[in-house]
């Protein structure tokens, strides 16, 4: 505790412990600068070599307060539990109070081998660093985008399984999630419509960009119903489903969005989803898709 750190026995024990462990370099917070002379005197009294000290600036929550778990600030374990990748957290922490130099000066994303290669104490700042959650989020999103599809699915599946218990095409879902995902822990809230259709207002079908209204949405879904009911249509082939819907839009003289925007609402009850209407249809499969389209038409009939 802080009480013991103020006692001579703490400094004494610290010096003895470090010496017995063969410590040659000590990296610690700048708040220990004032106690360094005491440590040095003890080393000299014992006739031991004084280690090399590197004092780092504190990490601040804001301009006045230090980041502290005692005050409820997130620890590494908390961040990982929320769905941040270990590599992203490590990358961001390395940039707190330290900056790369030379050819790496403008680079922000580093692999662990790169950090081992380029890190040097000369890049340590003398000024405190402020923990920026948005910056960490951006770095985490970049790490997620750089994962292979297989790696992303492996990391995302526990979060998907916690939210979706019905049969879905996980591979297609992950292909749509990966470019949109910033933090793995936010995946479940994006998927809550798969197991149960949420309540929604038909005004959600109105979209100026897609030129849709609740009235045109009913027309669009009625036009799509026979297309999606065709037994020859393979819901395991996303391109085939999209092409079939696109052909219907061309037949009606409409833009794709005029048909597909209402389809997305009918299947999810949401305006923002991990994928467009045909993506959702393929993830859910024919049976669920047809049931929800029919329910949407009935809802629009009022």
Describe these PLM feature segments.
Residues 7, 21-32, 60-92, 96-104, ...:
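Conserved phosphate-binding loops in nucleotide/dinucleotide-binding enzymes
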């Amino acid at each position: 505790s802080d009480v013991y750190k103020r006692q001579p026995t703490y400094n004494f024990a610290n010096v003895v412990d470090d010496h017995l462990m063969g410590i040659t370099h000590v990296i610690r917070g700048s708040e220990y600068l004032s106690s360094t002379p005491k440590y040095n005197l003890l080393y000299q009294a014992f006739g031991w070599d004084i280690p090399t000290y590197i004092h780092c600036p504190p990490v601040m929550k804001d301009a006045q307060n230090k980041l502290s778990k005692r005050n409820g600030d997130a620890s590494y374990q908390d961040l990982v539990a929320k769905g941040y990748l270990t590599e992203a957290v490590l990358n961001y922490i390395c940039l707190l109070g330290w900056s790369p130099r030379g050819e790496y000066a403008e680079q922000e994303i580093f692999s662990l081998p790169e950090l081992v290669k380029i890190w040097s104490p000369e890049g340590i700042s003398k000024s405190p660093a402020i923990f920026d959650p948005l910056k960490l989020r951006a770095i985490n999103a970049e790490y997620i985008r750089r994962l292979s599809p297989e790696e992303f699915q492996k990391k995302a599946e526990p979060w998907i399984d916690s939210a979706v218990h019905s049969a879905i095409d996980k591979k297609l879902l992950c292909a749509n999630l990966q470019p949109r995902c910033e933090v793995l822990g936010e995946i479940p809230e994006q998927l809550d419509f798969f197991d149960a259709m949420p309540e929604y207002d038909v005004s959600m079908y109105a979209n100026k960009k897609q030129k849709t209204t609740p009235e045109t949405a009913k027309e669009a879904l009625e036009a799509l119903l026979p297309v999606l009911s065709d037994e020859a249509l393979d819901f395991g082939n996303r391109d085939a489903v999209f092409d079939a819907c696109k052909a219907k839009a061309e037949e009606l003289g409409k833009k794709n969005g005029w048909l597909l925007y209402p389809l997305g609402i009918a299947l999810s009850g949401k305006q923002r989803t991990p994928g467009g209407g045909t993506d959702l249809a393929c993830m859910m499969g024919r049976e669920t898709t047809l049931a929800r389209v029919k329910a949407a038409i009935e809802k629009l009939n009022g």
